Amino acid sequence: MCLLGCDIGSSSIKVSIVDEETGLTIGADFYPKEEAPIKALRPGWAEQNPEDWWSYVKIGMKGAMRKAKVKGEDIKAIGISYQMHGLVVVDKNPITTSAFSPKNVWLVFLHPTNLSQIVIA
């Protein structure tokens, strides 16, 4: 059996697959191959689309599994680390779940007087 680790960062998604018995990494991949885009719509703001993260996770997992020569049923557990201070709000439907809006990433620098600009739905 194998363990899969996924690091969801603001520049890329990194995925590693480890053989449970030996502790050795048997496959790894990352995506996108160039730094993920970050939109700065105004000074001090930085946004990414959570839908892009999900696409990158799927691509990275497929790449790592291909390199490790394993199938989904060979994965015993998945561990996920995520960029700090992140919250992605989704709807309640598990089939069509999608993020409500682009996500401010950790490198947003909001002065307390600017916090009123954030709308909580």
Annotate each language-model stretch with its function.
Residues 105-121:
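Glycine-rich phosphate-binding loop plus the immediately following alpha-helix
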Residues 101-103:
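Adenosine ribonucleotide-centric catalytic and binding domains
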Residues 1-99, 111:
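N-terminal glycine/serine-rich phosphate-binding loop of ATP-dependent small-molecule kinases
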